[in-house]
């Protein structure tokens, strides 16, 4: 039952992201697929594998299955908002400077540790009998994870979405944070 809620929340988030996009067709479908799959699966499972919470073989199977599911959900989201036949838009220029990437990394580190403080009471039982990784290892892993999140958002940002900061923040929180925390 809760898996169904997880899928529904993910789908509704993709519908929102599709609805505010000015693009359509395969460009929009691909951007939703990348956003949904990387945020909900790849970047989360990376941490699980690196810190030995899940073996790589299990993560690979989950990644493959979720790629198919999210491809279908992204296509359905584009269809629901009536954008499958809409032409792609010319993407706006995006700031790719090292300074911007540095600020993204710092902001992600701050958000990661802040969110972790709030989430800890809900996940502490899961980690009760597992050794926690060294803090410096966790900090170091967040650098590539922050850049992976940038890569996840990049194709969608290229669709010229309206309200991008709010929708992207909501999408990251919902499909990367809230929905995965639903109990099995």
Model regions and ranges:
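Juxtamembrane/disordered regions of integral membrane proteins
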Residues: 1-184
């Amino acid at each position: 039952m809760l898996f169904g809620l997880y899928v529904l929340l993910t789908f509704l988030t993709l519908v929102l992201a599709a609805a505010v996009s000015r693009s359509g067709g395969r460009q929009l479908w691909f951007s939703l697929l990348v956003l949904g799959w990387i945020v909900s699966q790849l970047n989360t499972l990376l941490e699980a594998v690196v810190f030995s919470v899940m073996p790589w073989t299990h993560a690979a199977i989950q990644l493959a299955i979720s790629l198919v599911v999210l491809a279908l959900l992204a296509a359905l989201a584009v269809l629901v908002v009536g954008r499958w036949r809409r032409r792609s838009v010319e993407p706006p220029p995006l700031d790719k400077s090292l300074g911007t990437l540095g600020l993204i990394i710092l902001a992600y580190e701050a958000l990661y540790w802040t969110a972790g403080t709030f989430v800890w009471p809900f996940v502490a039982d899961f980690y009760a009998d597992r050794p926690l990784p060294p803090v410096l290892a966790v900090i170091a892993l967040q650098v590539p994870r922050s850049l992976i999140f940038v890569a996840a958002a990049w194709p969608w940002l290229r669709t010229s979405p309206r309200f991008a900061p709010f929708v992207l923040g909501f999408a990251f929180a919902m499909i990367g944070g809230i929905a995965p925390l639903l109990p099995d």
